[in-house]
Amino acid sequence: RLETNPQLKALVTIGMPVPGVSEEKFTRFGEALSFDGRYVSFWGAWGTGALNPASGGPGWKPITLTCPTDGNQDVIQSCLDQDNNGTSNDGIYTLYEPINQGIFVYDLVEKKTRMIARTTDANTIARTNDANTFADFLFWSFTGAPPGVGGGDEGSTDDREPPRWRSSAFAAVNQKNVAFKAIKSDGSNGIYVRHENDPVTTILDTKMTGDVLDKNTVIVAENEDATTVNVPLSQLYIATLGLERDGYRNKRLAISASMADVTATYSW
């Protein structure tokens, strides 16, 4: 229903209690939201103090990021040039992100927030053996427009964001179902889904081979000696997965995926 001069309403704010976590309040939110008209999914964190870029601080954990080696050469060079972290210009950064983070959903009708998944509670050893324990919901990339690059029909780079490290969480909501990307403690990552209070279910992850998506396709790859070889997707592992905020509608989930063999000789 359309309203005349509608007022903005705060649904979840910094300082509100974190559902399912005793005596904790939200300290940070992410920009990636998914909304289906009733439910809103979002990323949130708690337990973080002021961030010290050099040492982190209470509630923050160090992560190691490496400059990309593929893609736009100006972006890659900008990543190397900006690196004054540790050994300067080696392309290896130490940044920080919240220890305690999770995926949540807010119900506009019931006016309640529910936790979908969270990172491992470091104070509870038993959680590390939980098949649905997650290490991270943030995915990092070095992106932006390098100074002096562009122009012409696209305009100057002056009004475009310069390249830097950016983090994003990925979730999509469909009624009482929430699909999300996450990284497990073993380093694998995947797309997972949860319905209400049911256990989290794995949809796809990087421990699976490509034939879970396509049992029929066989790629024809060319070797260095110009000979060709037929490679079924059962010989390739899922390498990357993509999930968009509006990709989950009418009980159907749209994703993207790439695959490669363990030596990265063949890919699709």
State each model region's role.
Residues 1-268:
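Conserved "turn/edge" positions that cap or connect secondary-structure elements
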